[in-house]
């Protein structure tokens, strides 16, 4: 089950599912055949859509060249979307703080990981919790 106790789909669990892995393999096969593959999402803003937060991140890990077609027609890379996530969730990341002075500040990589988790929490498909009978 990919749903966590809070009732939303946990993308860290989804990526471990056989169906998800098979889907990634199908994309690899299609690319190996030189198909031009486009994945459509429901949201105009990719950072609000699982295609970027779930799929885009995993496709980058698998070596795909991921570009998001924006509403206006321009393209954004997954790296550019990660910058947007950092700006949204860690807008004060470049400020001098006691933690940064003491060497306890989060690394950029950790902030990106946390940003994906926070975005997942916001956009993950939700189900009603079943009450124990």
What kind of region is each of these model predictions?
Residues 1-133:
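Residues lining hydrophobic/aromatic ligand-binding pockets adjacent to catalytic sites
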């Amino acid at each position: 089950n990919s749903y966590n106790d809070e009732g939303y789909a946990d993308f860290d669990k989804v990526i471990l599912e056989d169906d998800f892995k098979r889907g990634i393999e199908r994309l690899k096969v299609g690319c190996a055949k030189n198909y031009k593959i486009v994945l459509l999402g429901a949201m105009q803003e990719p950072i609000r859509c699982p295609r970027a937060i779930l799929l885009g991140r995993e496709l980058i890990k698998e070596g795909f060249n991921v570009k998001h077609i924006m509403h206006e027609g321009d393209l954004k890379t997954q790296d550019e979307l990660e910058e947007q996530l950092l700006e949204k969730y860690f807008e004060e990341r470049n400020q001098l703080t006691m933690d940064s002075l003491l060497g306890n500040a989060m690394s950029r990589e950790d902030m990106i990981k946390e940003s994906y988790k926070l975005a997942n929490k916001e956009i993950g498909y939700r189900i009603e919790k079943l009450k124990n009978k």
